[in-house]
Structure formats: C-alpha cells, structure tokens
Amino acid sequence: YHSIMETLRIVEKFVPELEIIVVNDGSKDNTKAEIERAIKQDSRVRMVSSEKNRGKGNAIIAGVSQVEGKYVAFVDADLELNPSQLEGYLKKMLDDNKDVVIGCKFLKDSKLDYPFKRKVISMGYYIMLLVLFHLNVKDTQTGLKVFRVEAIKPVAHLIRTSGFAYDIELLVAIHRRGFSIAQIPVEV
C-alpha cells in the first residue's frame, strides 16, 4: 500500500495524468488487500490479479495488456530505485526521441556500490547479449524501465519466458523490431 501511494505521490508531480496498474501475482500475504485499499484511496490505481504465481513475465504481460496511456513504466514494488528517477527517463525519451529508456547500474554516473566480482559477472553477461543478440544493453534487470506503448504492447504477449529472463527476451524483441533503447544511470 505505502509503495503504491508513494509512487503516485512522486510521479504525479511530473506526470499528472497517470495510471498505476499493480499486478498481484498470486501473493499469499495481504498484498491483494493492500492493493484494494490503494484503489479505494485513488481511482488511478488498478489491479490485475492472479490466484497463483505465474512469474514475472506473465505478470508484465497481464499489466501491459491493461495499459491505456502512451507510456509504460516498470517500477519494482520494493522501491529499491526511487520512482522520482522516472522523470529523467521520460526527459531522455522525449529529448532524444527514444522508444525505451532503461536504468543501468553499470554506467559511470550510477550511484551505487557493487562488489568487483558482480561487476565482472555482469560484464560477461553484457558481452554475451552483445554477441548473441546484438543487444547493446549493459543491464537488463534494473527495476526501472520506460517504454513507448507502441514499442512494448505489440511484443509483450509474444514473449515465452515467464521468469526474470523475460526482460532480456522483451528487450531483444523490441530491438529486433527496430525500436531504439537508451540507458541512463541509476541511483540506489
């Protein structure tokens, strides 16, 4: 509940017309009740709910299918990355005419501290994506991403991966269709 309302409070400052679609992917705790509480408080909040956990990919497909706006943003529910950073993502998208803007923890100006070992593993992962898919994206797993609806809606439901590799397959599909992808530093 608090992360939903906090996201609304932050994002409405720079995107006055917004909707928040929260996907409840079969949670067994009080998540559904908390989402319903947020819906009662603000009509811009909507819920897509599944009785059983179907994985991140299916949750994204369910959420994207309900989008009515021009842009789609992914924000992890734990708010590890502050949603206020989305303002910079939208600015980059509009100023540079990009179709997708994703956060990248491994850009020079990112403000975080990762162990050297993790950086080396991530670099190997990046090289693999570049060689196999010609995808020049250093960090596919960051919890903040913004898409133009015309870049994501036609492909979201075509992705076969239901787990966390969904992001990779989605970005590869978008890239192969000629849409542009930009990366922006993140702050944890």
Give residue ranges: language-model regions.
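Short loop->beta transition adjacent to catalytic acidic/histidine clusters or analogous donor-positioning motifs
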Residues: 12-22, 30, 43-46
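Short beta-strand-to-loop acidic/aromatic patch adjacent to the donor-nucleotide binding site
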Residues: 70-78
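Catalytic donor-sugar/metal-binding loop of nucleotide-sugar-dependent glycosyltransferases
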Residues: 136, 160-162, 171-187
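Acceptor/aglycone-binding surface of glycosyltransferases and processive sugar-polymer synthases
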Residues: 44, 50-66, 71, 83-164
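Short, well-formed alpha-helical segments that are part of the catalytic scaffolds
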Residues: 1-13
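Short active-site alpha-helical segment characteristic of glycosyltransferases
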Residues: 81, 166-173
